[in-house]
Amino acid sequence: MSRSAIQVAKTATHLPDLVEVQRASFKWFLEKGLIEELENFSPITDYTGKLELHFIGSEYRLKRPRHDVEEAKKRDATFASQMYVTCRLINKETGEIKEQEVFIGELPLMTERGTFIINGAERVIVNQIVRSPGVYFKDEQDKNGRRTYNASVIPNRGAWLKFETDKNDLLHVRVDKTRKINAHVLMRAMGLSDNDVIDKLRHPEYYKKSIEAADEEGISSEDQALLELYKKLRPGEPPSVSGGQQLLQSRFFDPKRYDLGRVGRYKINKKLRLTIPDSVRTLTHEDVLSTIDYLINLELDVGGATLDDIDHLGNRRVRSVGELLQNQVRVGLNRLERIIKERMTVGETDSLTPAQLVNPKPLVAAVKEFFGSSQLSQFMDQTNPLAELTHKRRISALGPGGLTRERAGFAVRDIHPSHYGRLCPIETPEGPNAGLINSLATHARVNDYGFIETPFWKVDKGRVIKEGKPIYLSADLEDECRVAPGDVATDKEGMIVADLIPVRYRQDFEKVPPEQVDYVQLSPVQVISVATSLIPFLEHDDANRALMGSNMQRQAVPLLRPERPLVGTGLETQVARDSGMVPISQVNGTVTYVDANIIVVTDEEGSEHHHSLQKYQRSNQDTCLNQRPIVHNGDPVIIGQVLADGSACEGGEIALGQNVLIAYMPWEGYNYEDAILVSERLVKDDLYTSVHIEKYEIEARQTKLGPEEITREIPNIAEESLGNLDEMGIIRIGAFVESGDILVGKVTPKGESDQPPEEKLLRAIFGEKARDVRDNSLRVPSTERGRVVDVRIYTREQGDELPPGANMVVRVYVAQRRKIQVGDKMAGRHGNKGIISRILPREDMPYLPDGTPVDIVLNPLGVPSRMNVGQVFELLMGWAASNLDCRVKVVPFDEMYGAEKSYQTVTAYLKEAASLPGKEWVYNPEDPGKLLLRDGRTGEPFDQPVAVGYSHFLKLVHLVDDKIHARSTGPYSLVTQQPLGGKAQQGGQRLGEMEVWALEAYGAAYTLQELLTVKSDDMQGRNEALNAIVKGKPIPRPGTPESFKVLMRELQSLGLDIGVYTDEGKEVDLMQDVNPRRSTPSRPTYESLGSDYQED
């Protein structure tokens, strides 16, 4: 399998590190962000000004984490480090200085793979894309259809300032969406004279109307302006000049209350062509005057003033982990500041030390809240390595300070020309989040300001210069250049061949001669995201299907024996490597020891490097993480070489599925509507078998009647059921368990009231004290089975942290091998998905001229209407590759090598395969790409030739085992008394409004009546019905549903006198059948569950 297609060599530029976004951001936080926050925070003075507390941020230090990554996962702990910072307390009266190192909280650390471990679970902080601070100019239409312009100054934090024009050519200003104020009133309040303003404007005649309007209102001095400002901003409070002065100062000129941020200052300077230094983060008079000037130029349409496009990526920036965490630390420190000030006031001035003042709790709480419950801190998707990698590169517009799903319109979700090479136009979810959650393109990176950049080669007089490093441009810099796509054809010297080149210039497409091209894109793949770039022949697929293909690759279950694709795109190796699933050699050297658990590499100096491998660990999604060595003892290795395969990897490449022989033809209706017909070979040879590891947990708690006990002595259980339990009552590792088997024996003490009357009678007669415990053991749920692979016991004595009230926690891990079966979902890489409808014996499958039965039969009607023809190219290229015994890498967008290149390449490969001895039948020029198949049942040929070939097919995580569910009786909701919903709650199937209509339409009155009463929430009726069924009697008449009683009670609680009456006008008492001692329901029929159960 050494050969490779011609197409790979030219375009596969090496991608940058794909998790860099996460790592670089966290590194910035540790080196700069945290220090910045600690230093901005000091000094803190008490209310009298006697004491000052300084934080010396640059001297903070982190202690070694208490647990390493593996230990933290095992113990359900957080992988975090303690933060200490030097504090200086200065007593102004005595001049005394106390310096001390103070503990300020725990900071979760990022693992090498860009994740965090919080309470034992791996989490990812998703990057957020938000509107950049700065100044924005927009136009709106007023009621009369006249265009008005407005300018908004948006800070990083603080009050918004919005300038507007109106039909009378007056300028107004709003602060934080309050009432309109004449703009000149604000100028005068800021202490600017009329001449100061007029000198700065290029067209003062427009502005003079606003000055006149201010004079007419009688606001001619600074004091009057401040009073007016105070009245407008704080209506209802007595205005004062000093109040106005303070209000204006704190709103816009106090660095603690108003901050443009580095980015905001950069954007304002750039838009208004100012040269204010980076360190000035508040508003200046110059900013305000330049904004007004620019707005007037817009209104008069002079001076090259342009409107801003809010969806342009030059106006949206990415907030990664570091910045989100920095904001959170700021919140914690602000809470801390209040506490310190109070303690300074209350404490004895002389004896105070910094350690007494600083309480780590608020900071710890803020950081914990961010990692534990922020919308952007997500449980990592670990289904396979690609899912993990994509999750770390995700960019979300949701979250705190971002958009909400309901508010986001079409414009925000749409693809924008500036996304080109920065955000993937294809990979986004289907449904309500479409366009709000994006994926970073393959070559994109985030710069210091948070803008997304993408790389280009410089073009000089028509020659592409590919020396040195490529040049990275952000969206607004790129607008000023003419950029050609990555697939322009060039000759050996790098000169562009064509006469006219399509280029992008200022959001538009035009054609120019090669001399005018400024930059050319690095590679055709740089437009799309990592998942999309793994789809071969992507350019032949419709975008909607490519989207499904990208998303479904992330749901592929790692198989027992992974197989890398016959037809790939050349990026498989890098995806596997950057996902962190494969161990990589850090040094040049020799492998000196290998076994299943560890690989030792000895470098040239003779020191050993140990790589321990993960064996059968459970991932967040219950799939299996396992690493297998691929080097042997004595092998030489180089830096960056892959030492072992992870899950869903083979030979250091990502391998999400299997290459199987596929035929496109209908077969007895079993592949109608996207269903899939598969051969028994896939089951027998374990091609699509995967390992899943379930975690079961039980805790022994302290109850009012005494402690629960984990034990082997369980009442009323036969000895053979306890055969696999050890002396503590915990299952042994390696035991095979079926549904209903006991995993951990547990007994709970029961009180007097728990005993049924017959037991009380027995005890009264015989006087024996039966053991007062009931069986509360952990059992294997229905439909589950497997082998116990691990048991973990946590107790307080071992120093484990347990939940409150628990004395002991036992966890049992059960692994199961799942073969493929009817009802499982499978998919190709081109969005061609389906459900398995039947598994056919090998001998009944259609077979090739050489007798090979096909593995999968797909419906040919799935291709034309969906326009994902890429699957057909992949099929035939795979067919050629398997016959030539090689693997092929095809880079997407191959038209740069000539028109219809895909077609030509595939045909050439097929012809080459057919030229091999004995393989003439592989390619038939009369019917290219099709073969005459025979029916496996009769041996007769089908009447039409069929497209056959090898395709990479995936088994997705939507397995029928996890979905199939049935219920006879089970838990009911407490208020409505209706059965719960969902498999996890052992719930029933919902009979909704539309289903009721259907039954009504057929007049099926009795069926409907029992569905709405005894099968649902008529409590007495369902008990009686169950009783009647058990005893074989006729089922009695249904009563009143509980939900009707709830409705009555709700209406009565509104004060409405509502009741149910008979024809004779007698009121019916709906509550008569309610047992006065309703606390204990009649036992065996149902159990009610509290409302907390429903929320799950």
From Swiss-Prot:
The keyword Transferase belongs to this UniProt entry's keyword annotation: yes
Pfam hit, one: RNA_pol_Rpb2_2
Keywords: DNA-directed RNA polymerase, Nucleotidyltransferase, Transcription, Transferase
An annotated GO BP: DNA-templated transcription
Family designation: Belongs to the RNA polymerase beta chain family.
Protein name (database record): DNA-directed RNA polymerase subunit beta
Organism (species): Prochlorococcus marinus (strain MIT 9211)
EC nos: 2.7.7.6
Domain of life the protein comes from: Bacteria
